[in-house]
């Protein structure tokens, strides 16, 4: 029987704010699931305070490292650069066991940029990565202790889906709002389709927190678009299914370098929405092209506009995909992955 009574999680909890980016949501989900599944005391070190209350974060970190043997970390790129050497020191000094739950999908690039990362990562008990592709790339760089745990969310997967759709077909984006997530690509595609048909064939609703660096540009953009495009604000991560379940499909034309296993795809599948996504990072590992969505560019579909037009003209196929989406969504419920995490910590 495990003797573990407490662990710590170092990650971005968002302070007292309602922050809904992927890093914060993943950190909160892990904390809540472990809290519900174990009797452990779980300490929180919130990296949200790095610029707002740096002395508090430093003190919380020192207390955590001196008093806790098992530490899970979920860190941004800058967080890794600060915490990796500190954790490595305490690992060697006190035998601290570090479990790295990776945010995003570009760790292999960081290892190439910062060669010291290789030793840090190999000294951790495990690196939980979000895709098999990243695991293989890291293995080629000499990182040998990776296990795949995809993004998971405890969502109420729909039991049935809508089978009746007509013009205008409603599409949505459900992610952080920034240019690199393909927001402008999606707007341009929908506007171009409607213009070419001479009527409103499709609509686009955009959900998510607008990235600080993109706010001015996005506000200006929304002043110029047609009424077919609208911004719907933010939705709590556990309310996503209810918010998007009536849409025809989700658009995910991302080209963001930090993309890992996008939680928005789990949201979409749980709501029975096929996903139209770029062939970017691990999207093709999750979305089955022509099975529960479209990965483009492919042999027949070269861009987002073509993908949307294909879906509009192949309604029967898209509706059949919705059943596959719901089946796939059940793979991303937390239970099995939380058991895997607990087993690893208790070893």
Regions found by a protein language model. Give the residues of each.
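Short hydrophobic beta-strand element within catalytic cores of glycosyltransferases
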Residues: 251, 270, 274-277, 287
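A short, well-ordered alpha-helix in the C-terminal region of glycosyltransferases
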Residues: 303, 310, 317-331
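Glycosyltransferase donor-sugar binding loop
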Residues: 46, 203-217, 233
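Acidic anion/phosphate-binding donor-loop and adjacent secondary structure
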Residues: 139-140, 148, 152-168
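Nucleotide-activated donor-binding/catalytic signature segment of Leloir-type glycosyltransferases, i.e.
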Residues: 216-236
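Conserved acidic donor-binding segment of nucleotide-sugar-dependent glycosyltransferases
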Residues: 289-290, 294-301, 310-316
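Conserved donor-binding/catalytic core segment of Leloir-type glycosyltransferases
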Residues: 8-10, 163-181, 186-192, 204-207
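Acidic donor-binding loop of glycosyltransferase active sites
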Residues: 245-259, 273
